[in-house]
Amino acid sequence: MKTAMDIPDKEGQKRLVIVGGGFGGLKLARKLKSNKFQIVLLDKNNHHIFQPLLYQVATAGIEPSAISFPYRKIFKKREHFHIRICEAQQVFPEHNLLETSIGTLAYDYLVIATGCNTNYFGNDGLEKQTMALKNTSEALFNRNQILDSFEQAQNTGNKEERRRLMTFAIVGGGATGIELAGALAEMRKFVLPQDYPDLNINEMRIILLDGSSRLLSAFSEESSKEVADYLKKRDVEIKLNQRVMGYENYQLALNDGTAIDTKNVFWVAGVKANSLQGLPADAYGPGNRLKVDTYNRLSQYPNIFAIGDTALMISEEYPKGHPQVVQPAIQQARNLIRNLQRAETGLPLQPFIYQNKGSMATIGRNHAVVELKTVSYTHLRAHQTSLHLVC
């Protein structure tokens, strides 16, 4: 086993280790301010990423710095607080010990907020050949791939090769898929004519595929139709009830026997929770999520919690767990703050009750679909609304 991290114990304080600085982990670290706890935040990156806008980085709409927030700047005035950039590798629950890439760390409470990664459903070929969109590195890779495709298309005299370079297939018709399709449609309309005047914008194809019968299956049918109509007006080709069988030699094979000839495939068809070694197999549920009780605790270990995308809390209203979006992560973090404080004062814990404030997906610069509990609407200034829905 590796040597211990150089973080001294603080007398009279319980050590709370938070693995992951996403929306849930960051909210917990920022808002739990108590002399009863020494907080250690662990993350693979030295900054928080505002993931909902990664698609704009990928399509050259904004720079990575606009959605990256350094942890050391956020917490520079905090006392009893430590940050370590590392990868959590294995937990030893019987010893209250966490092993990381830079050493071991003892804990009194452990919060697993490791989020999700792209799910390729066991297809290694798709993982190697397609573009994902879960972090800044992937977004920048995608941006370079898109722009390089335009450059190559401008230089080639081969019509078939140019068609492959100018065809962009997006697999997954959820929020990320429709946002990416809308952003690419805007690139075709506004960027290509100015930056690549020698290219024929009509040769650029944007194809959005989904395995279900409609886009945005988490939204109402009315919202799904509104989004589909909007994208079609922007010449986005929509193919529903289509499953990808494989991708080889620039041929994206579909279950109906057809194939799309393209060098640009974005894979945003699903996610799976990031796992942590050392926990028993029965601690995990569908999608690699950790099964938790109504207090976000792992049933076998009362001092280990999971929040956000990695937590599977089953209820009558949410038999498959809460949606893997920002709101549940932030709300679970808030409830966990209260419960950690209550636990230290001997008070009973309070169960988590999810308050759905609504959902939103943006499609281009000034268009979005929004569903609140009592009303749904479209055609609004998207960015003015998004901050309210994720807070």
Where are these regions (language model features)?
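A Rossmann-like FAD-binding core segment of flavoenzymes
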Residues: 79-90, 185-294, 300
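FAD-site-proximal beta/loop scaffold in flavoenzymes
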Residues: 129-158, 251-253, 259-331
